[in-house]
């Protein structure tokens, strides 16, 4: 629950920070006409994840890129040391970036600018853009809500897609860890139940089924406690008569 809440907080913080940076740097506006509209957001596999689309469009693709990178950098700087240590593996899993805690923000910026400023992205003239997101799973019993900010340019949306990939991957990791923990707890309950059953079975056997030795002990216990003088009297009464 704590990890899930932490991820959702980070997602909300990043989206808020990106919106602020786009407004300040790229003069983006929610009311501006967007050259690109978002059509569909498709998950390869989805379990409890939602994506909301928010328009913050402008024509300055370069400024959009800088704003998104700057927002991510600021949020990363505010993470705990434990969260920072976890971040490089997320970028490797989501974006195939080999990085570490010391260089992660610079490596992320380099990746974004190389990928999203490529000719394949810049020259991709589209009106309606559909996005495909990898697997996303919310922690058990939770719903994870992500926000995709439509910048209105292919370059800006490319950067936003990379951010979304990392965030959904983080949710997937948390979900997997919590599911494993829940499975382990179930195993403990099962083992405990088996032990209790065996204990009850042992005592039931003691109550209703007796071994031969136990039966002999019970029979002996039922015999009256005869005083030794009784045996002497019995002997003399039953002794043969000598002629």
UniProtKB/Swiss-Prot annotation:
Domain of life: Viruses
InterPro entries from the UniProt entry: Virion_mem_poxvirus_L1 (IPR003472)
Induction: Expressed in the late phase of the viral replicative cycle.
GO cellular component: membrane; viral envelope; virion membrane
UniProt keyword Repressor present: no
Pfam families linked to this entry: L1R_F9L (PF02442)
Lipidation (N-myristoyl glycine): 2
Bilayer topology term: Single-pass membrane protein
Compartmental location: Virion membrane
Virion surface side: 2-183
Disulfide linkage: 34-57, 49-136, 116-158
This protein's UniProt keywords: Disulfide bond, Host-virus interaction, Late protein, Lipoprotein, Membrane, Myristate, Transmembrane, Transmembrane helix, Viral attachment to host cell, Viral envelope protein, Viral penetration into host cytoplasm, Virion, Virus entry into host cell
Signal peptide extent: none
Intravirion side stretches: 205-243
Modification after translation, per record: Myristoylated.
Keyword Signal: no
A GO BP entry: symbiont entry into host cell
Start and end residues of each stretch annotated as Targeting to MV membrane: 2-12
Subunit structure: Component of the entry fusion complex (EFC) composed of OPG053, OPG076, OPG086, OPG094, OPG095, OPG099, OPG107, OPG143, OPG104, OPG147 and OPG155. Except for OPG095 and OPG053, each of the EFC proteins is required for assembly or stability of the complex.
Family (UniProt): Belongs to the orthopoxvirus OPG095 family.
Biological role: Component of the entry fusion complex (EFC), which consists of 11 proteins. During cell infection, this complex mediates entry of the virion core into the host cytoplasm by a two-step mechanism consisting of lipid mixing of the viral and cellular membranes and subsequent pore formation.
Protein name: Entry-fusion complex associated protein OPG095
């Amino acid at each position: 629950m704590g990890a899930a809440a932490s991820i959702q907080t980070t997602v909300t913080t990043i989206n808020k920070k990106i919106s602020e940076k786009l407004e300040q740097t790229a003069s983006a506006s929610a009311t501006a006409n967007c050259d690109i509209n978002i059509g569909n957001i498709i998950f390869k596999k989805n379990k409890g994840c939602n994506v909301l689309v928010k328009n913050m469009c402008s024509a300055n693709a370069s400024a959009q890129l800088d704003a998104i990178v700057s927002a991510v950098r600021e949020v990363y700087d505010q993470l705990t040391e434990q969260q920072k240590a976890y971040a490089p593996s997320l970028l490797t899993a989501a974006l195939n970036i080999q990085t570490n805690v010391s260089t992660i923000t610079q490596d992320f910026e380099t990746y974004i600018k190389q990928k999203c400023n490529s000719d394949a992205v810049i020259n991709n003239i589209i009106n309606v853009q559909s996005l495909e997101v990898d697997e996303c799973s919310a922690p058990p019993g939770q719903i994870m809500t992500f926000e995709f900010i439509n910048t209105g340019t292919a370059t800006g949306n490319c950067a936003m897609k990379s951010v979304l990939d990392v965030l959904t991957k983080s949710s997937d990791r948390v979900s997997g860890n919590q599911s494993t923990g829940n499975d382990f707890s179930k195993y403990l309950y099962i083992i405990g139940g088996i032990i209790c059953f065996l204990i009850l079975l042992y005592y039931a056997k003691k109550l209703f089924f007796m071994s031969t030795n136990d039966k002999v002990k019970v029979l002996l216990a039922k015999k009256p406690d005869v005083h030794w003088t009784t045996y002497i009297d019995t002997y003399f009464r039953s002794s043969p008569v000598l002629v």
